[in-house]
Amino acid sequence: MERKISKIQFFQMFMLLLVTGAVCVLVYKAQIRENLHRPLEYTMMTEHKDRGEIVLSREMPEISEVFTCKTPELKKISIECVGKNVAAGAMLSMVLADGETGEVYFEEEKPAGEVLNSRIQKKVEMELKEPLKGSENKKLRLTWKLQNGDSTAFHITANQKNVIVDSFNNQKGDGTNVIYYLHYGDNTCLKGLYVLLCAALLFFEAMCFYLIVMRGLSVEQFFVPAALVLGLIFQCLFTVGSVPDEQTHLDTAYKFSNRMLFVEETENPYTIYKRVCDVEMSDMLTNGLETNSQYLLMTETFTEPENTELVEVPYQDASSLVPGLVYMPAAAGISLGRLLGLSAMLTLQLGRIFNLLAFVLLSWTAIRIIPFGKNLLGMTALLPIALQQGASASYDAVVNGGFFVFIALCLRMGKEERTKKWEFVLLGIFALFTATTKGGVYLPLLLLTVFVFGRNSGKKNQQEKTRKISAKWMITAGVLAVVLLALCIYKFMPVMQSFLQAGDMTADGSGMYTIPYLLAHPLKVVYLYWNTLMKRGDFFLHSFLGGALSWLDFEMSWLFAVVFLGGLLLAANMEEDRFVGNRKQKICMAAACALSAGLIFLSMLVGYTKNNLNYIQGIQGRYFLPLAPAFLLLAGNKMIHVQREQRAAIWMTVLVTEILLVLQAAAMTGMV
């Protein structure tokens, strides 16, 4: 029956949109306007990862880098370095000239001590007197020369740029880069992007109000359009490369794209073929949020690619801890962009869009399958951190969606009196996926199959038959568990071997914790786990709710986090949608989540934590997303009861809060 829409609801929608529009204007005037008329910033240096260095000294007194400037109206170049043993008479000459004609655009010679006389890294700036007109696509030569250096040594941060850098120290093809920042143009040109963002948010808000409040649709019905629209907004806000390790995931997806398109592999296992324009775009994108990425999104998405020839370049493969299947959506999107001859930016965005489609489809399937907790699962999938990962090229899009489906299947089959064959087939597939993903840290989730194989029949006259069937399935489950464990050990044996290597604790803290050491000191493990919870527990919760997005570049206010947490707790206690399992099932679910969390802690302890620390490093809230549908269901209790009629208000509160979060992220991360 069609639900009648009242005039009051139209008035409520109008007022909500009016208030949100006013907030958009307020954010612009209070936070964005004051940052206008500043140069755009392009980070050429790799961030959040290990980098190399070049030493300018008596042994190598001059460095010269020839690069293609891809930015218009170049204004300033910044180089990061640290000076050591700076001699009193040492002089440093800095020159920026045309790489072809030799015309000088910047030239300065200073005593080395004035430029840098510190053991702390510092950015040395070369600011042009006037913006360099026509700098885009111009070859430039950057030269630093040290004179009378004696013991002086400048340790300059460096990385590799495969296409943009033409030569280094006159070595053609050497992509060594020492430039940290390029500042160019004016960020005022990005105001239009903010206007489009606000328009998209208002459309999203109106759509959600219409579907949830006016039409009264269930989460199964409104989830797909809501997730797709909000996911696309997140893609524009968190551009290519701004999600942790996304460049590595794009490299891996590109490898599978080559296989889809029957591109031959290189002779070197550490290189692949890529389009020149795609490599160039990767060189232009940084590991983080910056105005340059927003500018590229605005100007390069719908352009014609300049060079689609294939070139052999180094790449990083991230498929060792996951099945290659998780990269298929992104690889398909990249392949489509290459076949259609689209720009590099649009090709990479298509990879992200296909990943988003996979995440939304898997999450929606889980919502359809799960017998209870539908609203909780939908709200979890729409959390900022879930959408950030789901709308990126990261394998987390498929991994998180796949785990959601597995948990939903276990709960569904545990509730049904008669299970279907397709459910067992699907359960086996996703159980295999669970066992062979992320180093096996989520392997304890297989305990949830107890819901399936340990359930009791509700009819007395079928008890004998049920016992026979249960025995058969328990044997099958046991065999399957052994096979899955063997597959897990086989796939992750190289990683396990590195963890199992014995190692001595180093006095300087440069070593890592190892499994043999931890086995010999079990109390040390207890202390490390406890200290981690006490010191970092608030960060885990905050980042799980979306409190630290991108490469932790944006920190969300706890005001937003409280709303998201409250929404999840209320969703777990909605009428006709709360978990109604017995005590044994709750204990099993809690044990599965606790064991997985313990393995996550252990993996980061032996794989990331220096042995001079008394807590575990590197753990983020997003690592617990695959467990969320299970452990959040345990929040259901008799003290909280949410009536069905209150569902729409809770959903709109959470979604409007997410809109406000996006506005704050745009303002604080430098969209303009």
Which residue ranges define each predicted feature?
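Membrane-interface alpha helices of multi-pass inner-membrane proteins
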Residues: 388, 423-439, 444-450
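Perimembrane helix-loop-helix junctions
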Residues: 409-418, 442-482
